[in-house]
Regions:
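Periplasmic-binding protein-like
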Residues: 40, 115-123, 187, 191-232, ...
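Ligand-binding cleft/hinge of the Venus flytrap
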Residues: 48, 61-70, 148-166, 194-195
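A ligand-binding cleft/hinge motif common to bilobed small-molecule-binding domains
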Residues: 81, 97-106, 153, 176-177, ...
Length: 269
């Protein structure tokens, strides 16, 4: 009798809990407004001009959100704060040229890849450095908590020779003022800097093949699927390709035309 009574009491409680869980998941998937984190020290993907956040990633996420019937609030922060903020649920998604990596996939979800990149070596025009192979013993600057740091430490660069900065502009400044012998960073950003500063050059081959994805909080259930759907829509409409015209002069070497799933393109680290 006691067991039957307990079952009778427990059944509606369990059903109610299950219903509550379903409602929570549904509300996350049915968001009409999202908060997107961005690091504005990553031109031409993210930058701030006259107090306005702009760039390839910003225009892209706004276009995706519009295609999905979502409104977007951009919340700026250092790159190193994006993943923790996604884990805490204080932001729903993040764009900042975030490389899809297996280690990051344990903490956050990713959309399908939207940009193919890689790391390159940037030096001053008169430098005798010809590529990554002869960087040992030289001071190399880069941005804190990025895949550039991971690559260097896993490929024989002594950490004492790695100068990490909160933003990439400070790394470039270190190079120009002889505080560093080279910069290793995402190639499109290095190329963007090089076009504006004729006293520097990129040397050697691309060091990696990396893909950027929209990072999504695991607390925002179903949002990654919406990002994928919106990305497919703006590719079909031509908006995606117009972004390459606007920010890269029509150079689509980084365009991802096929659907590239995170698990298939993630950097294994």
């Amino acid at each position: 009798l006691k067991n039957k009574s307990l079952c009778a009491i427990a059944a509606p409680l369990i059903a109610g809990l299950a219903l509550s869980m379903n409602v929570t998941t549904a509300s996350a998937a049915d968001k009409t407004a999202i908060v997107v984190g961005a690091d504005t020290t990553f031109p031409p993907f993210e930058t701030e001009v006259n107090g306005k956040v702009t760039g390839f990633d910003i225009d892209m996420i706004r276009a995706i959100a519009k295609a999905e019937g979502l409104t977007v609030t951009i919340k700026t922060m250092p790159f190193s704060g994006l993943i923790p903020s996604l884990q805490a649920g204080s932001i729903d998604a993040a764009v900042a040229g975030i490389t899809i990596k297996t280690s990051r996939m344990q903490s956050v979800d990713f959309s399908d890849a939207y940009y193919k990149s890689g790391l390159s070596v940037l030096v001053k025009k008169d430098s005798k450095i010809t590529g990554f192979g002869n960087l040992k013993g030289h001071v190399v600057a880069t941005k804190k908590a990025t895949s550039s740091v991971d690559y260097m430490t896993s490929h024989g660069i002594d950490p004492q020779y790695i100068k990490q900065f909160q933003d990439i502009d400070s790394a470039y400044q270190a190079l120009e003022t002889n505080g560093a012998d080279a910069v290793i960073f995402d190639n499109p950003v290095n190329v963007n800097f090089k076009t504006q500063h004729p006293n520097v050059k990129t040397v050697g081959d691309l060091l990696t093949g990396e893909y950027y994805g929209i990072a999504v909080s695991k607390k925002a259930s179903g949002l990654d699927a919406k990002m994928n759907d919106g990305l497919a829509k703006i590719k079909k409409s031509g908006e995606y390709h117009q972004l390459f015209v606007k920010y890269f002069g029509g150079d689509e070497s980084g365009a991802v035309n096929a659907v590239e799933k995170p698990a298939d393109v993630a950097v294994k680290d």
